[in-house]
Amino acid sequence: FPMLLVDKIIEIGDDYVVGLKNVTGNEDFFNGHFPEEPVMPGVLVVEALGQTGGMLALKDVEDPEEYSTYFMKFEEVKFRDKVVPGDTLLLKLQLVEPIRRGIVKMRGTAYVGSKVVVEAVMMAMITKTKK
């Protein structure tokens, strides 16, 4: 099964995207992180931002199913609060600069309600998928 950490894209514009992830107690990562107090690993919240940003990166690409985004760099990553079962993650990404030569730079913010839980600036490259 693919590791999908976005349930739905709820809005997409020229330079931004908004996604949603309903965090349930059935997520595999909760088994060991932590059994007594389940917390979604922060790196998986960053991954959810990345997956949402991938939709923005590929939205204007012809035949997007033939391409992937691979992350090159993360900067200014801040973990502000924990994410627990029952939370709904709102994932917002905004282009920092126009996409050039397949390089995408975005600022992402993950929210639970109105509270910021993770922030990051990320850079990715768009590459043709090898078949």
Residue ranges and their predicted role:
Residues 9, 40-64:
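Active-site helix/loop of acyl-thioester processing domains in fatty-acid/polyketide metabolism
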Residues 1-40:
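Catalytic strand-loop segment that frames the active site of acyl-thioester-processing enzymes
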